[in-house]
A protein has these predicted regions:
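Short beta-strand elements in bilobed, periplasmic/extracellular small-molecule ligand-binding domains
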Residues: 52-66, 181-188
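Short, well-structured alpha-helical segments in soluble
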Residues: 72-84
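Anion-binding alpha/beta catalytic cores of soluble intermediary-metabolism enzymes, centered on
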Residues: 88-157
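Glycine-rich phosphate/diphosphate-binding loop of Rossmann-like nucleotide-binding domains
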Residues: 35-49, 129-206
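Short beta-strand segments enriched in small/hydrophobic residues
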Residues: 27-37
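Non-catalytic terminal and connector segments of soluble metabolic enzymes
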Residues: 2, 54, 81, 108-111, ...
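Short acidic/histidine-rich motifs immediately flanking catalytic phosphotransfer sites
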Residues: 82-87, 201-204
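Positively charged, low-complexity intrinsically disordered leader regions
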Residues: 1-26
Length: 206
């Protein structure tokens, strides 16, 4: 079996992006909305800001208390959607109040939807439309397979997990008629029976 190491590819892509952004008269700007004081979210945001800085991407961190209402957040997103100086928007998940989390994601302009969570981007991906923003981890996996010249056409891929961040969009992506894809995909979850037998059938395990 072959374990793919993404660090080398990540360095190559990062260098290319940094080179492209270095010559821009106006730097790209990423707005990040952080609601509450989730420790894991704080770490993720700190890493994202550090990465953006290394790529010559400016960031605007908007902190909101855990008591922020749906309307509070939607008003900020509306303002960011309309701001021509903002190129990308991230709402760090999970929100303290998950009851309106989907509504918040849906409010982001699909063209600025860095995480690829909006119905417009997910719908385009489902329809095989390459003109969409794809969730970062699935897109990274696709690029990694391409980097290693691995084609999944006709192959069986087993994905462990069906999260909206990785498993679900990845299963859609790898089953499309895109270059290197065209795979037969099995998505397993916590209720999957005979998992060991299924895993034994895989060509690629994610």
């Amino acid at each position: 079996s072959l374990i793919l190491n993404g660090k080398q590819l990540a360095s190559i892509i990062s260098a290319e992006i940094a080179q492209q952004t270095a010559v821009l008269a106006i730097k790209p700007r990423l707005a990040i909305i952080l609601v509450g004081n989730n420790l894991a979210s704080e770490i993720y945001i700190r890493n994202k800001i550090s990465c953006a800085k290394s790529l010559n991407i400016e960031t605007q961190l908007i902190r909101l208390p855990s008591t922020a209402t749906k309307n509070n957040i939607l008003e900020i997103i509306k303002s960011l959607n309309e701001d021509p100086t903002i190129n990308g928007i991230i709402v760090q998940a999970p929100l303290p109040n998950k009851n309106f989390q989907e509504t918040v994601f849906e409010a982001i302009d699909p063209r600025k939807d860095v995480d690829g969570f909006t119905p417009a981007n997910i719908g385009r991906l489902c329809n095989g439309n390459r003109n969409c923003l794809v969730a970062c981890t699935p897109l990274g996996i696709w690029k990694l397979l391409s980097y290693y010249n691995i084609s999944l056409s006709g192959k069986h891929v087993v994905i462990l997990g069906r999260s909206r961040i990785v498993g679900r969009p990845l299963s859609i992506l790898l089953s499309q008629k895109f270059e290197g894809c065209n795979a037969t995909v099995t998505v397993c979850n916590s209720q999957t029976k005979h998992l060991a037998e299924i895993i034994n059938l895989f060509f690629v395990l994610v």
